[in-house]
Amino acid sequence: MTMKMMVHIYFVSLLLLLFHSYAIDIENEITEFFNKMRDTLPAKDSKWLNPACMFGGTMNDIAALGEPFSAKCPPIEDSLLSHRYKDYVVKWERLEKNRRRQVSNKRVKHGDLWIANYTSKFSNRRYLCTVTTKNGDCVQGIVRSHIRKPPSCIPKTYELGTHDKYGIDLYCGILYAKHYNNITWYKDNKEINIDDIKYSQTGKELIIHNPELEDSGRYDCYVHYDDVRIKNDIVVSRCKILTVIPSQDHRFKLILDPKINVTIGEPANITCTAVSTSLLIDDVLIEWENPSGWLIGFDFDVYSVLTSRGGITEATLYFENVTEEYIGNTYKCRGHNYYFEKTLTTTVVLE
């Protein structure tokens, strides 16, 4: 073996050793992070944890009344931990004040907690899940849920010519349960034929190809679930109101007073306004920048608030309490959309 080859092998071995050591350090830091999380749990939760198991976090999932609900055990869903657990079984238990009860098989589907008809009584319940691998390692997590009212029909506007080659995508907003059987789509109460020409379907998305004005209308998606206790499918629906509009003029006018007249010790504000040529679209975003060029958000002392309606977008810059340090400062208003960008400035002056 030549000296050059020996040196090459040495450096490769050293790199592998360093990488292995680094990976171990990362895993140890992840474990320490979750151990600290365990220490912050309230006593009513921590008392049920098995000290021989690692803690894998908590989850507070969204649920809708009268609809199916499902939740994964937190360590299985957490990107920091999921790679550790491949072949495993999951045990679910309901935590009560002075005891814990095993969740029946009818409330477990594919290892996930499954509630076919979520009612308000479930919103106060806590569930402990224990993941056990084939080699005996275990990790635990705690799941809660909170109620969110499903939205009514969600409006969506599509402008012809924006991305016609990709089509219009409509998302069926079922967020509360996994493991559905299928989704059927309707337009104006008539079932859509998924022919992969005009309409195609990918997961929860309906794609409308070759968009045209006539594609406007009401779109309903019906999600079908099954449950061993219920003879017929469980069906949940969502709807979208799609409005297809002709190609628009995206130019806009930016309006801003060049001076902010202020008084020391008092609040002040100034509004930057973008008026779109077309009142059918609100596609202008307005941002304020401080004298250093940093974007101003919703912070203390100086902050901005954005509103948009009917082709008019406004961003108001607020000063909670004007001090001498603000006098003479110049702030930049930047309005932009996909097509155009404009900027104006204003300077703080004493009245």
From Swiss-Prot:
Name of the protein described by the UniProt record: Soluble interferon alpha/beta receptor OPG204
Induction of its expression: Expressed in the early phase of the viral replicative cycle.
Signal found in the keyword field: yes
GO biological process: symbiont-mediated suppression of host innate immune response; symbiont-mediated suppression of host type I interferon-mediated signaling pathway
The keyword Signal is assigned to this record: yes
GO CC annotations on file: extracellular space
Function noted in UniProt: Counteracts the antiviral effects of host IFN-alpha/beta and key IFN-inducible proteins involved in viral RNA degradation suxh as host OAS1. Acts as a soluble IFN-alpha receptor and thus inhibits the interaction between host IFN-alpha and its receptor.
SUPFAM superfamilies per UniProt: Immunoglobulin
Cystine crosslinks: C73-C129, C172-C221, C272-C333
Domain Ig-like V-type, residue spans: 246-345
InterPro entries cross-referenced by the UniProt entry: Ig-like_dom, Ig-like_dom_sf, Ig-like_fold, Ig_sub, IL-1_rcpt_fam, Immunoglobulin_dom
Superkingdom of origin: Viruses
Assigned keywords, A-Z: Disulfide bond, Early protein, Glycoprotein, Host-virus interaction, Immunoglobulin domain, Inhibition of host innate immune response by virus, Inhibition of host interferon signaling pathway by virus, Interferon antiviral system evasion, Repeat, Secreted, Signal, Viral immunoevasion
Organism: Vaccinia virus (strain Western Reserve)
Protein family per UniProt: Belongs to the interleukin-1 receptor family.
Subunit text: Interacts with host IFNA1.
Chain ranges of the Ig-like C2-type domain: 65-147, 155-237
GO molecular function: receptor decoy activity
Subcellular location field: Secreted
Pfam family, one: Ig_2
Residues carrying covalently attached carbohydrate according to the record: N117, N182, N261, N269, N321
